[in-house]
């Protein structure tokens, strides 16, 4: 059987046509790719050949579609692209210009700049700021900060060339030095200080609660209160309770959402090695207090460890920085500018070192001594920390028929009797006065609310350790008695008896001058003889 020559020829032609078609398709693809690459290269060449664009700061827009900008420190009036929504631009916003100096694109706000401090808020869009070397300038507020509540002392970033403020930096020197809060301490949380609390409430709360009566009697509220006494007896707690109580009195006077402010000034951190910085910080603190008080809110400015800042001038006990710090505080308290709704509370255990000009009437009018707690006050303080909701040991509960409240009350009485017993076990120091008289001081003479809290905490820790060792849960009276003894022993070496007179001032044992102190607590121990520490008559200069 033979093949048809015509059929064979057609098949060869078809194969050749298919091959040519494939070549044409590959060639078309190559040409298309080359064309696209040429277009892309041309685009890149065009981009590279473009003149440089310029960035400027938007100032204002006009009805005819033109805008005012600031470019490189020059104010210019230029056109804007029709595709750009000019009405949405904000003052201080960054914009992009083409080679014809036409605004073609909107950007954001500058995030960098020089750091300045607000000295005065002039109006809705301008502030007076202080920069380097105390240079003052008036700058405009950009749209990013125009609606923010600015206050004196705030740190801002500013572009000096355009004169715009772009950002409020969360770094205020005042906020570093004060704690602006409303404490949650109530008068009911403080034990053993009923008389002192009543005195400070009369001095602070009455003028705020009944201002009409004070005006009727021509009586001005006190400007300040000094709380003084030994350490750990509740001075700071009382100041916090005053602020919390004033906060609770605001709402009944019809100020919705209002509160009081407690500015807890960290005294030693105010001190600065640069001349005038401490005084500036004090001015900023009182400016913040006046700002809050101008809204009708009571403000408590609390200076803890007041003697660290406001020592008696001219004593030579320090570098004499107080010669300018003390007058600054005096000017703030009773200067030309009135200080309304602001109460200054100072706390100190060395009130003898505070400048007398601060303590005179008209400045710190009310002076309240916070005494060490007596036996009755100690029971009240124990009741704040040793409460019936704590786990009590079953053996102690069984003695009182399972009555939880009676058991806790009995435990408190037992530990207070042990703490305030005037027996040989509780003897602490023997002091000799300048007249030659001697007196035995007991541990009760150095008790404080802080020490009572520590005794209860020790007992709780011992109860936890006993539970882990024996499986018996709860606090026992033995835990409290042991904690009391351990607290006494731990405080044996703590009093600084090198200078008896200074020690007496800190410990609250004022009166006749003490010339000699002898520790007798070690008589109860097994090692050594009683420790005797004599007064150092001349300390000289120590390196």
Curated annotation (Swiss-Prot):
Homohexamer. Assembles into a hexameric ring structure that caps the 20S proteasome core. Strongly interacts with the prokaryotic ubiquitin-like protein Pup through a hydrophobic interface; the interacting region of ARC lies in its N-terminal coiled-coil domain. There is one Pup binding site per ARC hexamer ring. Upon ATP-binding, the C-terminus of ARC interacts with the alpha-rings of the proteasome core, possibly by binding to the intersubunit pockets. This is Proteasome-associated ATPase. Consists of three main regions, an N-terminal coiled-coil domain that binds to protein Pup and functions as a docking station, an interdomain involved in ARC hexamerization, and a C-terminal ATPase domain of the AAA type. GO terms for biological process: modification-dependent protein catabolic process; proteasomal protein catabolic process. ATPase which is responsible for recognizing, binding, unfolding and translocation of pupylated proteins into the bacterial 20S proteasome core particle. May be essential for opening the gate of the 20S proteasome via an interaction with its C-terminus, thereby allowing substrate entry and access to the site of proteolysis. Thus, the C-termini of the proteasomal ATPase may function like a 'key in a lock' to induce gate opening and therefore regulate proteolysis. Signal peptide: none annotated. Gene3D superfamilies: 1.10.8.60, 1.20.5.170, Nucleic acid-binding proteins (2.40.50.140), P-loop containing nucleotide triphosphate hydrolases (3.40.50.300). PROSITE patterns: AAA. SUPFAM superfamilies: P-loop containing nucleoside triphosphate hydrolases. Pfam families: AAA, Prot_ATP_ID_OB_C, Prot_ATP_ID_OB_N. Keywords: ATP-binding, Chaperone, Coiled coil, Nucleotide-binding, Proteasome. It comes from Xylanimonas cellulosilytica (strain DSM 15894 / JCM 12276 / CECT 5975 / KCTC 9989 / LMG 20990 / NBRC 107835 / XIL07). One of its GO terms (cellular component) is proteasome complex. InterPro entries: AAA+_ATPase, AAA_ATPase_domain, ATPase_AAA_core, ATPase_AAA_CS, NA-bd_OB-fold, P-loop_NTPase, Prot_ATP_ID_OB_2nd, Prot_ATP_ID_OB_N. One of its GO terms (molecular function) is ATP hydrolysis activity. ATP binds at residues 232-237. Pathway: Protein degradation; proteasomal Pup-dependent pathway.
